[in-house]
Regions:
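Hydrophobic h-region of N-terminal signal peptides that target proteins for export
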Residues: 11-20
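Extracellular carbohydrate-recognition regions
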Residues: 21-40
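Extracellular beta-strand elements of beta-rich domains used
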Residues: 30, 210-215
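Carbohydrate-binding surfaces in secreted/extracellular proteins
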Residues: 30, 89-91, 152-180
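Short carbohydrate-recognition loop motifs
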Residues: 49-69
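Secretory/extracellular carbohydrate-interaction modules
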Residues: 63-127
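Short, aromatic/His-centered strand-loop micro-motif at the edge of beta-sheets
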Residues: 132-153
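Flexible glycan-contacting loops in extracellular carbohydrate-active proteins
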Residues: 180-206
Length: 220
């Protein structure tokens, strides 16, 4: 499947600039392969690829919201400790869904039952930025914001026990806050960062795309 991602590439480059005071902990431009340190949860090798400076993942049937926890191809890596300083994670996402709740997300992820996700999702026929919190499989929507776009920047900022989600529409200069809340607190939970997508149609092949992934330590 071919993608025409000129605006997407510009979006990824547009929010890659950072303050000189901030520390780049990790970045991945998906230049021909995945960067070091990523692992897959329920990997299906035929349903992901790295191409053209981006990670493309098939949006397959399955779910991660609530009790089902059968979504495939969750890409995860350890998150920096945010107890003593803010951590910021960002990525550019393109998603062209046709199926109810079909979505592509950036998440602060502990396990399948504990996370905060921020993504581009189709809800009742409308493209939306959706932010949601899940703890012990109990879910709560923190934001659902209609947006007429299939490509967007997503950003999570975590400090202490709080998390905030922002989004950056293509062509915009300033991030827009989507929502905020408390992090879930799983017993002995170790925070990870995840890129994932799910709730795709069973009878069509849809692919979401991620680019320009960054983890920063924010200097206050």
């Amino acid at each position: 499947m071919k993608f025409a991602f000129r605006s997407f590439t510009g979006l990824a480059l547009g929010f890659a600039s950072i303050s000189a005071a901030d520390e780049v902990v990790f970045k991945d431009d998906f230049a021909g392969k995945l960067g070091e340190g990523w692992t897959w949860v329920r990997e299906e090798k035929s349903a992901w690829r790295v191409a053209g400076g981006g990670l493309e993942v098939r949006v397959a049937p399955g779910n991660l919201w609530g009790h089902a926890n059968d979504a495939r191809n969750l890409l995860v890596r350890p998150a920096p400790d945010a107890a003593n300083g803010a951590v910021e994670v960002s990525v550019a996402v393109t998603n062209r869904p046709t199926h109810q709740y079909e979505q592509a997300n950036l998440a602060w992820y502990y396990d399948d039952s504990h996370m905060v996700k921020l993504g581009l999702e189709l809800v009742n026929g409308e493209m939306c930025i959706v932010m949601g919190r899940e703890e012990a499989d109990k879910t709560r929507t923190l934001a659902k914001i209609p947006i007429p776009a299939t490509s967007v920047g997503l950003r999570l900022r975590v400090a202490g026990g709080r998390i905030r989600g922002d989004y950056l529409p293509a062509g915009a200069e300033k991030w827009i806050e989507a929502g905020a809340g408390e992090l879930p607190a799983p017993p002995n939970g170790r925070a990870k960062i995840s890129l994932h997508c799910y709730q795709g149609p069973p009878d069509a092949e849809h692919w979401a795309r991620f680019a320009g992934f960054r983890i920063l330590r924010i200097k206050q």
